[in-house]
Design a protein with these regions (language model features):
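Asp-based, Mg2+/Mn2+-dependent phosphohydrolase catalytic module
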Residues: 64-67, 80-176
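Conserved SAM-binding loop
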Residues: 55, 73-76, 132-133
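Metal-dependent phosphoesterase signature
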Residues: 23-61, 69
Length: 176
């Protein structure tokens, strides 16, 4: 049983699973290979995404409204695409998403704008035509610095960063 400081947990939140496995192995000197840690993560995560992970409050309504009004919808995730697909399929939103991109596909974590830029390229739009909805402080810094319009979506995981998130984003929403 080991604990991670808030700063590190926010950093891990923007990483791919293999990056997180490497980070955790180094930070906690775990006597497993990074691949074994990754596989442990993967198995736990798959089970959660397949059966449990809920949508954020009102996410379904927002996506449906956006599609109805002719907007394109992308999912840009630090997770692997198949995990996002599990949630989208289970919640009935898969058909409403125009593209799903991952940090792995973009070759960088959300500390780089590459994943957002890839989503834009797939939808044939520019960053100024795109609004990023995010809940991670580091991802918000990245998106804002790259010229995207940003909307912070409150998440209890980032509650300690909420004040800073609000300071740097264009808009904020707290949905319950």
């Amino acid at each position: 049983q080991r604990q991670m400081c808030i700063r590190d947990s926010h950093q891990v939140a923007t990483m791919t699973l293999i990056q997180a496995a490497n980070f955790i192995k180094e930070q906690f000197d775990i006597p497993k290979t990074s691949e074994e840690i990754f596989n442990d993560f993967q198995n736990m995560v798959i089970e959660e995404y397949r059966n449990t992970i809920p949508l954020k409050p009102y996410a379904r309504e927002l996506v449906k409204w956006m599609k109805r009004d002719g907007y394109k919808v992308a999912v840009a995730t630090a997770n692997e695409i198949h995990l996002s697909e599990m949630v989208l399929e289970r919640t009935g939103l898969m058909a409403d998403v125009d593209t799903i991109v991952s940090c792995t596909m973009a070759g960088a974590s959300k500390e780089s704008p590459a994943v957002y830029e890839l989503a834009c390229a797939n939808m044939r739009i520019t960053p100024v035509e795109c609004v990023i909805f995010e809940d991670s402080l580091r991802a918000m810094y990245t998106a804002k610095k790259a010229g995207f319009v940003t909307v912070a979506v409150y998440d209890d995981v980032a509650k300690d960063s909420w004040e800073e998130i609000c300071r740097i984003t264009d808009e904020q929403v707290v949905l319950e």
